[in-house]
């Protein structure tokens, strides 16, 4: 009987370790973040840089508001600008992190959104762009991770590129299931850190979000 209860306690601790989170690109107030926190969501990932080539000031404020609500795991993501008129890869990271610092707040992890949108066909150039972003983040002492999946990675840098496999992976796959069971390894990652399991939906407290899960 004693062993039975120990087994139950261990099972419960594993289940309770799983965490729910959201990523957002619309304005959310501190009070709404408090509602989201109370609804059981423990990590937040606002967008802090637009693919159009500018800092997402709404996202930076979301970082600040989320922390003011008592959330401690607050990240940010960059949707890079790939046009010839855009700032360099390093300067996009610099602008994002400088904006976060200027707002008097911080992010836990900077995620680089690597998905098919305006990326050139040149894998070598794309790899260099990503490497420059990662290097700039590390120069700031900022923890950095990659947002991508098998098909995006294949098209943008090629499946033989494992250059960022030491970083955490945020994996989008809208299968409606909060687990890693359908994950297919790519880019040197044996498993992801986060699963984005639902595309944009009305989430906690009426906010439009993508739903995420950490086991």
Swiss-Prot record:
UniProt KW Signal keyword: yes
Single Gene Ontology BP annotation: killing of cells of another organism
Residues in the signal sequence: 1-17
Cited InterPro entries: GH25_Enzymes, Glyco_hydro_25, Glycoside_hydrolase_SF
UniProt keyword list: Antimicrobial, Bacteriolytic enzyme, Glycosidase, Hydrolase, Immunity, Innate immunity, Signal
Pfam families assigned to the protein according to its UniProt record, in alphabetical order: Glyco_hydro_25
Homology family: Belongs to the glycosyl hydrolase 25 family.
Primary role: Plays a role in resistance to Gram-positive bacteria S.aureus or B.thuringiensis infection.
PANTHER family named among the record's database cross-references: LYSOZYME PROTEIN, LYSOZYME-RELATED
Entry protein name: Lysozyme-like protein 5
Organism: Caenorhabditis elegans
Gene: lys-5
């Amino acid at each position: 009987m004693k062993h039975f209860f120990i087994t139950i306690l261990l099972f419960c601790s594993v289940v309770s370790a799983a965490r729910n989170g959201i990523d957002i690109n619309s304005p959310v107030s501190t009070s709404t973040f408090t509602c989201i926190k109370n609804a059981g969501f423990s990590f937040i990932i606002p967008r802090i840089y637009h693919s159009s080539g500018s800092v997402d000031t709404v996202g930076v404020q979301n970082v600040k508001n989320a922390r003011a609500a008592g959330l401690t795991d607050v990240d940010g993501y960059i949707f890079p600008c790939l046009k010839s008129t855009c700032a360099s890869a390093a300067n996009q990271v610099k602008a994002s992190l400088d904006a976060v610092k200027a707002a008097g707040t911080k992010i836990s992890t900077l995620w680089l959104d690597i998905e098919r949108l305006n990326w050139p066909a040149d894998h070598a150039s794309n790899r260099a762009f990503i490497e420059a972003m990662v290097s700039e983040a590390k120069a700031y002492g900022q923890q950095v991770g990659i947002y991508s999946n098998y098909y995006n990675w294949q098209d943008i840098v090629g499946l033989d590129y494992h250059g960022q496999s030491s970083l955490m992976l945020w994996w989008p796959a809208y299968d409606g299931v909060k687990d890693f069971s359908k994950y297919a390894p790519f880019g040197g990652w044996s498993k992801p850190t986060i699963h984005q399991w639902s595309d944009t939906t009305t989430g906690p407290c009426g906010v439009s979000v993508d739903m995420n899960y950490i086991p």
